[in-house]
């Protein structure tokens, strides 16, 4: 494994999509008209999704929430998986997809960039069953037109934390801190962590560093890992440069990360419950923990392209996506938390303990991904924070050794 592996390719990709990723929040493109009534399905549906989010039983026949939908609606589902939020934004700019399962660090870019349309929740009858903590969440409910009434730009799908995944043969007891991936140290097996850890291959990882500093360096005054002034941002970058000396590979592909834990000697990394579940199912000595510093996380929203070619099938899927059966099955498969609390009981795959295990009660402790902006979100108009475009360019520099 080499730290440089993939860096050159990812730098080229980021540079190609940088313009699309950093549209200023004020440059709103024309928004499409909200759909007011539905017609017959168009026969197809094209979705951009995280790996593991749209399953049709190919990996495990018990996990299939596509086949019955296709039979009932005639809408044939095509899925394009994306490994990062930046890739999702770039794909949505191509304009050939209907829906995207966007995390909070992509959703507002899509809204203010004019890439998604408001959703008429009256056409999604089960919307009222969505967790009240998510129904009007700021990463998808936005007053774009300034009329004082926020519009919904999607339907909540799943949420959860970014966990610390570790090898139980190296860590007989769960590590309590993210320090194992940020600070050089001797691990319980007697060897250094250098060359045995990973970090996420995306600019939003800067928030993980800021979250760590918020706990360990309170003198920096960080209160929100996504709203950083220049000094706080510089401190986070310094920590990431320190981390770079320890990193064997920056990961963005879930399946590559799983192979690295299985075959390449990686023993600790930030990860998703999806990888933890699959590795454990395969018998690997893997577990995960929610460290003392807390964690960043994701609350994903199914959003509809402003020029969706199959709007009727899109709305049929939006309703299907929040059915308790799908929500529970997906949570069991991915290790996430359902957006619909009713899915937490009576699901054979998830079990009645599943939501608690996956973090249902940790909502307030998770610092959910969102797009960093110059507006610090405070009452002081004189303060400015580092916007996402600078997160992108600086993270490229960090992993490139600068």
Explain the meaning of each model-derived region:
Residues 1-44, 402:
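Short, low-complexity disordered leader/linker segments with a strong preference
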Residues 32-110:
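Early extracytoplasmic/lumenal segment of secretory-pathway proteins
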Residues 46-60, 104-256:
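Extracytoplasmic ligand-binding site segments that recognize negatively charged/polar headgroups
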Residues 98-102, 250, 267-272, 287-288:
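Paired acidic/hydrophobic, glycine-rich loop segments that form the ligand-binding mouth/hinge
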Residues 106-111, 270-285:
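A ligand-binding cleft/hinge motif common to bilobed small-molecule-binding domains
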Residues 126-130, 234-243, 282-306, 351-352:
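Periplasmic-binding protein-like
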Residues 295, 300, 305-370:
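Mature extracytoplasmic/periplasmic domains
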Residues 365-402:
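Conserved C-terminal helix/tail region of periplasmic/extracytoplasmic solute-binding proteins
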């Amino acid at each position: 494994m080499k730290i440089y592996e993939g860096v050159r390719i990812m730098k080229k990709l980021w540079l190609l999509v940088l313009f699309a990723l950093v549209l200023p929040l004020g440059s709103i493109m024309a928004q499409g008209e909200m759909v007011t009534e539905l017609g017959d399905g168009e026969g197809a549906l094209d979705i951009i999704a995280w790996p593991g989010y749209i399953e049709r039983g190919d990996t495990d026949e018990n996990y299939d929430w596509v086949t019955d939908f296709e039979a009932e609606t005639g809408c044939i589902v095509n899925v394009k998986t994306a490994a990062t939020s930046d890739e999702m934004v770039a794909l949505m700019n191509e304009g050939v997809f209907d829906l995207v399962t966007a995390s909070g660090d992509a959703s507002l870019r899509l809204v203010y960039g004019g890439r998604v349309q408001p959703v008429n929740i009256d056409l999604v009858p089960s919307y009222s069953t969505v967790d009240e903590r998510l129904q009007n969440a700021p990463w998808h409910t936005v007053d774009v037109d300034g009329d004082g009434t926020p519009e919904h730009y999607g339907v909540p799908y799943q949420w959860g934390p970014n966990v610390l995944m570790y090898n139980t043969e190296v860590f007989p007891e769960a590590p309590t801190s993210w320090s194992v991936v940020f600070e050089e140290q001797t691990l319980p097996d007697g060897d250094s962590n250098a060359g045995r850890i990973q970090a996420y291959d995306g600019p939003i990882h800067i928030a993980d560093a800021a979250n760590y500093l918020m706990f360990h360096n309170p003198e920096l005054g960080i209160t929100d890992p996504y709203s950083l002034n220049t000094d706080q941002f510089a401190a986070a970058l310094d920590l990431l440069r320190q981390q770079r000396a320890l990193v064997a590979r920056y990961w963005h592909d879930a399946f590559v990360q799983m192979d690295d834990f299985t075959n390449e000697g990686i023993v600790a990394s930030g990860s998703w419950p999806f990888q933890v579940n699959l590795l454990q199912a395969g018998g690997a000595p893997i577990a995960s923990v929610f460290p003392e510093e807390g964690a960043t996380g994701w609350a994903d929203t199914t959003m509809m392209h402003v020029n969706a070619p199959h709007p009727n099938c899109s709305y049929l899927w939006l309703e299907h996506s929040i059915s308790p059966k799908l929500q529970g099955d997906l949570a069991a498969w991915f290790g996430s938390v359902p957006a619909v609390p009713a899915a937490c009981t009576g699901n054979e795959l998830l079990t009645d303990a599943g939501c608690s295990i996956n973090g249902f009660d940790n909502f307030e402790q998770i610092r959910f991904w969102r797009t960093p902006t110059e507006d610090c979100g405070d009452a002081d108009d004189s303060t400015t924070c580092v916007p996402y475009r600078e997160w992108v360019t600086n993270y490229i520099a960090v992993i490139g050794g600068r």
